Swiss-Prot record:
Similarity remark: Belongs to the RecF family.
Protein name per UniProt: DNA replication and repair protein RecF
Chain's gene name: recF
InterPro entries with a match to the protein in the record: DNA-binding_RecF, DNA-binding_RecF_CS, P-loop_NTPase, RecF/RecN/SMC_N, RecF_2
One GO cellular component term: cytoplasm
Organism: Xanthomonas oryzae pv. oryzae (strain MAFF 311018)
Amino acid sequence: MHVMRLSIHRLRRFQTVELHPASALNLLTGDNGAGKTSVLEALHLMAYGRSFRGRVRDGLIQQGANDLEVFVEWKEGGSAAGERTRRAGLRHSGQEWTGRLDGEDVAQLGSLCAALAVVTFEPGSHVLISGGGEPRRRFLDWGLFHVEPDFLALWRRYVRALKQRNALLKQGAQPRMLDAWDHELAESGETLTSRRMRYLERLQDRLIPVADVIAPSLGLSALTFAPGWKRHEVSLADALLLARDRDRQNGYTSQGPHRADWMPHFDVLPGKDALSRGQAKLTALACLLAQAEDFAFERSEWPVIALDDLGSELDRHHQARVLHRLVSAPAQMLITGTEIPPGLADAGALLHRFHVEHGQVD
């Protein structure tokens, strides 16, 4: 898929701006604070329902405005015969939102997020590797959400059961009142875990070749999965039953896929905690690119790739390796930087350039 038009209104420095990206490589340059990242934020907001720099109400809306608006028009479909044009709009006040997709009102942000797929690498992406388990769970679930149509319903089923069980635990409910939700949590949780495990196994097969190209010195060799309970010993139903007294005392559910995690393993390093910040960024980028390649294989089209401030996040050598990998694929890319990243010349990439200044994009 590739974005043909992106319109932004009342978002950070932008009062009104519109750009028409090329279908391949797009570079947005400008001084620090000019608004380059805000363009990617707008696209990310439509694809994820949130900014990668915080909540909508935490500074994303232009000062003095009541809300922001983003409109995206894009083509999707893996072949000319199957291509179609799609349009989505989102108005967000930080508290309330309204959205439209292909001329119809949408009741859930998930409908917009399911339509437009964007893989974003930005200065905070290292938390995928160096942070806690939540971003890694989101990473898995994003991939499943976009390649398995029924995954969202399964995920919502599990989350609903978890919320209900936790509410009962906080109320000090009697054990028999937990039985129905334990059954629902165990049934949906086992299925959710199986999906995540299969996806991670598939992703590992894509990740290792990507990592070998863009960061061979890391020696990334495997991904391991921790399901959130001792699955090799007991079923989730049994784990919930065994932990019931402790959960009632603590007021929350201690076992299940909401506590799952995964970890990269390296031939030359003892583990993710031994990574420098730069190595964590490279590992995160390799994971994101592997996820994009998996999306392309499963959906027969590439997601949009957004790379924020690539020149300062990676040195010239690694920039060239990343871009050389990407320019060989029919993916639309939007890259920001204060200047043309040196690695672009090394990768031999043709680009469409935009300049961002004083709240305008030229």
